[in-house]
């Protein structure tokens, strides 16, 4: 299935993230929870 936009933004490779995005550090887009 498709990811929600804010979940998709979590990872740089556009992989499906969890339900929460870790907004810590400079690479927040790569930090998924």
Curated annotation (Swiss-Prot):
<feature type="site" description="Essential for stimulation of [3H]ryanodine binding to RYR1">
    <location>
        <position position="33"/>
    </location>
</feature>
<feature type="site" description="Important for stimulation of [3H]ryanodine binding to RYR1">
    <location>
        <position position="30"/>
    </location>
</feature>
<keyword id="KW-0800">Toxin</keyword>
<feature type="site" description="Essential for stimulation of [3H]ryanodine binding to RYR1">
    <location>
        <position position="31"/>
    </location>
</feature>
<feature type="site" description="Important for stimulation of [3H]ryanodine binding to RYR1">
    <location>
        <position position="6"/>
    </location>
</feature>
<keyword id="KW-0872">Ion channel impairing toxin</keyword>
<feature type="site" description="Essential for stimulation of [3H]ryanodine binding to RYR1">
    <location>
        <position position="7"/>
    </location>
</feature>
<dbReference type="GO" id="GO:0090729">
    <property type="term" value="F:toxin activity"/>
</dbReference>
<protein>
    <recommendedName>
        <fullName>Imperacalcin</fullName>
    </recommendedName>
</protein>
<dbReference type="GO" id="GO:0019855">
    <property type="term" value="F:calcium channel inhibitor activity"/>
</dbReference>
<feature type="disulfide bond">
    <location>
        <begin position="3"/>
        <end position="17"/>
    </location>
</feature>
<keyword id="KW-0964">Secreted</keyword>
<feature type="site" description="Important for stimulation of [3H]ryanodine binding to RYR1">
    <location>
        <position position="11"/>
    </location>
</feature>
<keyword id="KW-0108">Calcium channel impairing toxin</keyword>
<keyword id="KW-0528">Neurotoxin</keyword>
<feature type="region of interest" description="Important for stimulation of [3H]ryanodine binding to RYR1">
    <location>
        <begin position="25"/>
        <end position="27"/>
    </location>
</feature>
<dbReference type="Pfam" id="PF08099">
    <property type="entry name" value="Toxin_27"/>
</dbReference>
<dbReference type="InterPro" id="IPR012632">
    <property type="entry name" value="Scorpion_calcine"/>
</dbReference>
<feature type="region of interest" description="Important for stimulation of [3H]ryanodine binding to RYR1">
    <location>
        <begin position="19"/>
        <end position="20"/>
    </location>
</feature>
<dbReference type="GO" id="GO:0005576">
    <property type="term" value="C:extracellular region"/>
</dbReference>
<feature type="disulfide bond">
    <location>
        <begin position="16"/>
        <end position="32"/>
    </location>
</feature>
<feature type="region of interest" description="Important for stimulation of [3H]ryanodine binding to RYR1">
    <location>
        <begin position="8"/>
        <end position="9"/>
    </location>
</feature>
<feature type="disulfide bond">
    <location>
        <begin position="10"/>
        <end position="21"/>
    </location>
</feature>
<comment type="similarity">
    <text>Belongs to the scorpion calcin family.</text>
</comment>
<keyword id="KW-1015">Disulfide bond</keyword>
<keyword id="KW-0960">Knottin</keyword>
<feature type="region of interest" description="Essential for stimulation of [3H]ryanodine binding to RYR1">
    <location>
        <begin position="22"/>
        <end position="24"/>
    </location>
</feature>
<keyword id="KW-1219">Ryanodine-sensitive calcium-release channel impairing toxin</keyword>
<comment type="function">
    <text>This toxin affects the activity of ryanodine receptors 1, 2 and 3 (RyR1, RyR2 and RyR3). At lower concentrations the toxin increases full openings of the RyRs, and at higher concentrations it inhibits full openings and induces openings to subconductance levels (30% of the full conductance state) and reduces the number of full conductance openings.</text>
</comment>
